[in-house]
């Protein structure tokens, strides 16, 4: 896609189609900068086109340990993934509160919480469609470099790269010190993600270009957990803007296939 807006709308269109075809879909939802445009487009579709989420179940992809929905704090200071999803998406659509699932970031027993989250996904029938980004170090969810590609929901320590990114992108701007920011995260595992029936992976900007190339064209390795996308056997859609796609060696071929696919209404790989 030419730009972030086009990327976001393309992803939202796929999610909307999923929800229309299966109103009780189970969605796995990522947070961060990249998917904000997707959620805003889905909100627009809900308000202007009547897209309903009333029977949808939603599972957030991860949550920072020690963070949780705190409505008392201003949104800029509450950096929990639960608050993000509420402010950017859930409060604007008709999804039922009981169908929204978050990791409990305040848990005193992370292992138990992760097991319960895994079980809740299973009891819901599994994830129908999982929305993902990719970290600058290639992490999927918060499965940092070295995480097992067969991992289930688990607690992970954040790497220096992720901590630096989080500090510069979020915490420094609101006066939170490095010592005060979260250093651990509860996340769906790579194995959990790979069991979703459909995947959408998004990436935007030149800062993601090299890691996108490594994940899609390089070896499958636990050092770049997003490279596990190459193992995925279901329906996967990777949506990149021009900047994020700029280092792919086969970009001309991909663009050619995209044009042919649109012309003949085919899905090419």
What are these regions (language model features)?
Residues 52-129, 252, 258-268:
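Ligand-binding beta-strand-loop-alpha-helix segment within the catalytic cores
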Residues 28-32, 59-61, 103-104, 131-134, ...:
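Short beta-strand segments
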Residues 1-27, 44-47:
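N-terminal glycine-/serine-/threonine-rich phosphate-binding loop
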Residues 112-115, 140-147, 151-153, 211-215, ...:
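A short secondary-structure junction signal
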Residues 28-38, 120-145, 269:
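A glycine-rich beta-strand to alpha-helix segment
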Residues 39-40, 44, 48-69, 126-129, ...:
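Active-site histidine-anchored catalytic micro-motif
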Residues 141-188:
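Class I SAM-dependent methyltransferase SAM-binding "motif I" and its flanking Rossmann-like core
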Residues 188-191, 195-269:
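ATP/nucleoside-binding phosphotransfer catalytic cores, i.e., glycine-rich phosphate-binding loops
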């Amino acid at each position: 896609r030419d730009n972030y807006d086009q990327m976001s709308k393309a992803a939202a269109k796929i999610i909307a189609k999923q929800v229309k075809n299966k109103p009780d879909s189970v969605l796995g939802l990522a947070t961060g900068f990249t998917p904000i445009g997707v959620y805003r487009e889905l909100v627009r579709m809900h308000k202007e086109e009547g897209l309903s989420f009333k029977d949808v179940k939603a599972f957030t992809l991860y949550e920072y340990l020690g963070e949780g929905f705190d409505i008392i704090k201003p949104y800029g200071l509450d950096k929990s993934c639960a608050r993000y999803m509420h402010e950017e998406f859930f409060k604007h659509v008709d999804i039922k509160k009981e169908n929204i699932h978050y990791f409990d970031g305040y848990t005193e027993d992370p292992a138990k919480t992760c097991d319960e989250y895994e079980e809740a996904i299973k009891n819901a029938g599994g994830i129908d469609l999982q929305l993902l980004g990719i970290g600058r170090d290639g992490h999927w969810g918060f499965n940092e470099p070295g995480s097992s590609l067969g991992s289930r929901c688990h607690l992970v320590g954040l790497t220096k790269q992720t901590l630096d990114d989080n500090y510069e992108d979020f915490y420094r701007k609101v006066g939170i010190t490095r010592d005060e920011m979260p250093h651990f995260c509860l996340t769906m595992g790579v194995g959990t993600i790979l069991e979703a029936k459909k995947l959408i992976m998004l990436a935007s900007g030149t800062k993601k270009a090299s890691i996108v190339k490594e994940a899609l064209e390089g070896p499958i390795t636990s050092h770049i957990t997003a490279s596990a996308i190459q193992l995925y056997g279901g329906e996967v859609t990777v949506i990149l803007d021009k900047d994020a796609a700029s280092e792919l060696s086969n970009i001309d071929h991909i663009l050619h296939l995209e044009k042919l696919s649109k012309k003949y209404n085919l899905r090419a790989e």
